[in-house]
Amino acid sequence: MKIVVTEAMPTQCAEASTTEASIPQVVLITGAKSQLAQALLRIAANIGELALNSNANTSTNTSIPLELYALSRSQLDITDAVNIAAVFDQYRPSWVINCAAYNAVDAAEHDAIEANRVNALGPELLAQQCLLSGARLLHVSSDYVFGGQAVCEIAHAAERVVCDARESGVEQHQNPDLAPNSNPNHLPRPFVELDAPEPLSTYGKSKLLGELKVVAVLGDGATIVRTSWLYGQNGHNFVNTMLNLMRTQPSLQVIVDQIGCPTWSDSLAKVIWQLVMQQRSGVFHYSAQGQCSWYEFACEIQRQALALNLLSLPVGILPITSADYTKQALNRGISLAKRPSYSVLSSGKLRSTLVTLNALLMPEQIEWQDWRQQLNRMLRRLS
């Protein structure tokens, strides 16, 4: 398998074989510098070889090797139709995995034009070129397409946690049992693919619009993967932010009334490769198992980081409601986007769909582990 991450266009992609089954098929990965693109390349390199099933609906063992090219924005601007056409003409891809996205949730409230250009127009232009060329498109979306429902139980539970913390005067950083239980029976069920989206923010609306544009062009041939609370060893994400703050700040306030599920980028990458290898289409949800609040996530990050000597001393972690956090931000002149109070995704459809073609992709079934286990796997790589 050939993996290339470069600013230089290749002069040729796949002309080394005379038999159709052995001619490598090209996979383009957009947003090469994103944490997901890096995870896709890392997983592919660890596996050593990827291959398409030439007939995903049968038991045939015929496979086609893949060549991977990860393209940065300077190499492939997904909002530029002319640039896209030139890149497709040069590489002639069989698959495109779109990791390029505008992910600045708060900034999008004041930059809706750019958010929609990248998150909606870009996927649409990619889909149009895929339709013209016969390539397949896998587009990555977000749990933030959901969240329009009011979840009073979460707010009430969060208020109780905050009040208890204030009354006790305890900064919760040493005992994980002090973290609130975000899995009471009265919480909503995780979202499935057929649930109606109802985004709250400009970012969420732009991601939903991107999905709709892709499906409008490709119909049933589109592959869309929604994920949540993505983190990894590379890039800007909640885990790296918390670790940096825990090394420099005496205490932290973390939101307690937004419930979701953290997802390790490497696990998502493994799932994406399985979808590509099996040439699956449809809308799928993927996250780790379980659910938590940002506050619980922060407490668990610190607990594990201390155990792995990634942190030398604990810091105080105090729960705060979204309303209070927003007020504090406004007092500092910062406007925050609305976020869903509950955006847990059900991965059941995806899990039942996938049939492992390469055992190396999931030797320990980490894709279906609890979020705490996935977090531990990632943090151990940093220790």
Please identify what each model-predicted range represents.
Residues 2-7, 361-383:
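Amphipathic terminal alpha-helices
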Residues 81-118:
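NAD(P)H-binding glycine-rich loop region in Rossmannoid oxidoreductase-like domains
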